[in-house]
Amino acid sequence: MDLKNSVAIVTGGNGGLGQRICHALASEGANIAVVYAQSAKEADAVAHELTGHGVEAAPFACDVTQSAQVARLVDEVTKKFGRIDILINDAAYNKSIPFDDLDRMTVEEWSKIIDVNLTGPFHCIKAVAPVMKKQGRGRIVNIASVAGLGPSGSSIAYAVSKAGLIHLTKCMAVALAPHVLVNCVAPGLLEGTRATANLSNAQIERSASGALLKRAADKDDCADQVVTFCRADTTTGVTVAIDAGRSFH
């Protein structure tokens, strides 16, 4: 699919990885709806930066766990841009809780993580599906994690939410075929993100040494794969790990 003059919704578009994805899509000519739950000032700044690519961009507030807000978001984006070609589900929430500390994994924490990371993407996909079907084309890319490929990550709820998102990708690929393609990117530890902000260079290097490519992936690697999925015409239901080969080595 040619991305020039397309319209992309990027949830979590004001975050570190979300911003990089927005810029990668905008560099291909896509107009961007930068969706945020908090920090309107930051989202507005991102939208302003994106116009430097010669595209239109605007911030939109939305709590993806609330289906009514998601429906309003889709309506507002459609009214502003006239169409929706791409949905990137990048909004996420996590709290670091060791797997064996079940007392700290309260029902409230579990529910919040699952609601944002899994139910939120479901709301967004369900809301954009009628628009994309009517247009006869659409691309949806979910941002999961290698924690969804095996029992790893910073909490049980996070790993389960990302595993669910990977399976939701497959199910929605079936539900929305043949014109709407649904794929998933599963990043590992990415340099330059909040996940690595508190790690020392030695810790990052130690993690990278366990990867086949002997390096850590970064936000650009992830954003490039998102663009590849959006441009692809025959790939759907696929999850690609962006971790330099660490997750299966």
Residue ranges of model-derived segments:
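Active-site helix of classical SDR
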Residues: 125, 161, 169
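Substrate-binding pocket helix/loop in short-chain dehydrogenase/reductase
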Residues: 98-102, 106-111, 140, 196, ...
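Residue(s) in the substrate-gating loop at a strand-loop-helix junction
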Residues: 145
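Conserved glycine-rich cofactor-binding loop
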Residues: 7, 14-15
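The beta1-alpha1 cofactor-binding region of Rossmann-like NAD(H)/NADP(H)-dependent oxidoreductases
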Residues: 40-41, 61-73, 107, 220-221
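C-terminal substrate-recognition "lid" of short-chain dehydrogenase/reductases
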Residues: 2, 125, 137, 177, ...
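Alpha-helical segment proximal to the catalytic Tyr-Lys
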Residues: 130, 173-178
